[in-house]
Amino acid sequence: TTLVLYRMGDFYELFFDDAEKAARLLDITLTARGQSAGKPIAMAGVPFHAVDTYLAKLIKLGESVAICEQVGEVGASKGPVERKVMRVVTPGTLTDAELLNERADALLVAVVSQSVRGGVAKSTDQTPCALAWLGMASGTLGLTECTQRDLAGWLARLQPAEVIYDRERIPPALGPFLAQPRGTAFTPRPTWQFDAGLGQRKLCEQLKVSHLQAYGAESMSLGHAAAAALLSYAEHTQGRALAHVSS
């Protein structure tokens, strides 16, 4: 789940279960205001000028955070001030130097396996897999296809901050990583986002080319599927096109 921070004046506030979770993880005060369904509304907040410090703590713990900013003017109309989610910060989509800490870049990796649907896939060591990765700060983009046997090795080399995967086709090699994440966030995504045709189009648009032959990726259909989910997720979290990604 994603924690939601609402900008309210000089603070970013969280409510209900988000407030309780944030209070526990960040060691901040949990309060209450008003009522909903006869129960007090849990509330916790952090000063807006220190939000990056708290974001860094949450990201280090593997959490994802949506930043909801005020877009309407206070007092311009009756009722609540209009707010809008401006960006979503996840472990693999960091671009702010303050949040990256010791990492030069935080890699976001998408993994897909050519296998049957329904939970953890029944496959062999030779089952085709693909990885697509993106360094959000550096703007570097990579793509490879491999076998199930080599998937764990690729993840060990890349050391991603976040891995997204098809929730209906989970590569067995991901099992040990999911059981013991060890500093990597794992985010399931719906199967329809791993669309090879969409991925090929997105790659061409992103790289400003008409085909992928120069990159040796024209026929990597499984890689295109991973790229589709990767680029869609990155664009969603940033709330904009990835103009800095060009290689």
Q: Which ranges hold each PLM region?
A:
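Charged catalytic and DNA/RNA-contacting regions of genome-maintenance
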Residues: T1-S247
